[in-house]
Curated annotation (Swiss-Prot):
Keywords: DNA recombination, DNA replication, Endonuclease, Exonuclease, Hydrolase, Nuclease. SbcCD cleaves DNA hairpin structures. These structures can inhibit DNA replication and are intermediates in certain DNA recombination reactions. The complex acts as a 3'->5' double strand exonuclease that can open hairpins. It also has a 5' single-strand endonuclease activity. The lineage of its organism: Bacteria, Bacillati, Bacillota, Bacilli, Bacillales. One of its GO terms (biological process) is DNA replication. Belongs to the SbcD family. It comes from Staphylococcus aureus (strain Mu50 / ATCC 700699). Pfam families: Metallophos (PF00149), SbcD_C (PF12320). The gene is sbcD. This is Nuclease SbcCD subunit D. SUPFAM superfamilies: Metallo-dependent phosphatases (SSF56300). GO terms for molecular function: 3'-5' exonuclease activity; endonuclease activity.
Length: 373
């Protein structure tokens, strides 16, 4: 049996004001073409199909087109669950009709009680749920963390699980120790959101969404597929794609398959003048770029100048702000007022105070000292 594991499409994502629908349409077309080659028995999408609870019309159309090609044209069964970004009601609309074509949409965490059996494999679905939802459902005020809530959900099905079959869990959550990125919205506020690996011991394999790095966690049977695209500059350089899972005689193997996007996220560090004069290596001018530059404080609008050469510049950082990060041994308390001002001015402008500026500042400081006396 061959299973494809994907997640975190985040359709409708806007990165630093840039709409990514073109990039998402490109990567989904590539994914569909890959599925024609793979001919899987089933595709699993582990949450966060959309980036917002209220996706745009274009984002909805993009999902419909991709799912239509995969499920209706290629006749591939699909299981999809909701993530913390998805609007459950919108994603679940028409779910009962779609099951006639083996498109299984699960948005309620209680669906874990109703596994989907395909080719002798039991797929248990555990969509994203808040701690309060689980606490209310179980009428248990002692549930205060995701660890406690998820444990309770799995305990409810443990007595019924068929130990002679292959049992796979599909969920959207954070496993303890998983590597996070800036584009992942925290699952909870004020409670512990990560879940320990041991909670999943009764399953033969666990397919997860939420964390965007495909190797967020090192484990033989607990895997994240990662997102289809890089969605924050903290993900620059990360491979993106999907996982192929094969089951032969009860033995499970998986491999990560990378996909090449239309554009990647790239971080460029250097001197402003070198970048403007194109003396700094950029992999692809069409990539989405974050420049971290020095010596640009004298430039009125550096972002505009950069975009004339690199149209997809999405972020710009003045590296002088990090001037002392590697030299934080300097104790400000040991400096006099004038020295602190000189350091600050140099830190911000990368220039020394002029004689006139120094004299004016000294006069101001002296006047303030007289007032204190």
């Amino acid at each position: 049996m061959k299973i494809i594991h994907t997640a975190d499409w985040h359709l409708g994502k806007i990165l630093n004001g840039k709409q990514l629908l073109e990039d998402q349409a490109y990567i989904l077309d590539m994914f569909v073409e890959k599925m024609k080659e793979e001919e899987p028995d089933i595709i699993v999408i582990a949450g966060d199909l959309y980036d917002t609870t209220y996706p745009s019309k274009d984002a909805i159309m993009l999902l419909e087109q991709a799912i239509g090609k995969l499920n209706l044209e290629l006749r591939i069964p699909i299981i999809m669950i909701s993530g913390n970004h998805d609007g459950k009601e919108r994603l679940n609309y028409g779910a009962s009709w779609f099951e006639h074509n083996q498109l299984f949409i699960r948005t309620d965490f209680t669906s874990i009680n109703s596994p989907i059996e395909i080719n002798g494999v039991n797929f248990y679905t555990l969509p994203y749920a808040t701690v309060s939802e689980m606490k209310h459902y179980f009428e248990d005020d002692t549930i205060e963390t995701h660890q406690q809530g998820i444990t309770r959900c799995i305990e409810t099905i443990a007595p019924e699980i068929d130990e002679d079959a292959v049992n796979i869990l599909i969920s959207h959550l954070t496993v303890q120790g998983g590597k996070t990125s800036d584009s992942e919205r925290p699952l909870t506020i004020g409670t512990v959101e990560s879940v320990q690996k041991g909670v999943f011991d009764i399953f033969d394999y666990v397919m997860l969404g939420h964390l965007h790095h495909p190797f967020s966690i090192e484990d033989d049977k607990i895997k994240y597929s990662g997102s289809l695209l890089q969605y924050s500059f903290s993900e620059a350089g990360q491979a993106k794609g999907y996982r192929r899972l094969t089951i032969n005689d009860g033995i499970i193997n998986d491999v990560f398959i990378p996909l090449k996007p239309l554009r990647q996220l790239e971080i460029i560090s250097g001197e402003y003048n070198d970048v403007i004069n194109e003396k700094v290596h950029v992999k692809n001018k069409d990539n989405y770029l974050h420049f971290k530059l020095k010596n640009m404080s004298h430039i009125t609008d550096p972002m505009m100048s950069l975009k004339q050469i690199y149209p997809n510049t999405l972020a710009l950082t003045n590296e002088t702000f990090n001037y002392n990060e590697e030299n934080n041994a300097i104790e400000i308390s040991e400096k006099d007022d004038m020295s602190i001002i000189e350091m600050f001015y140099k830190h911000i402008t990368d220039k020394e105070l002029s004689d006139i500026q120094s004299k004016k500042i000294k006069n101001i400081l002296e006047n303030e000292l007289r007032k204190e006396d």
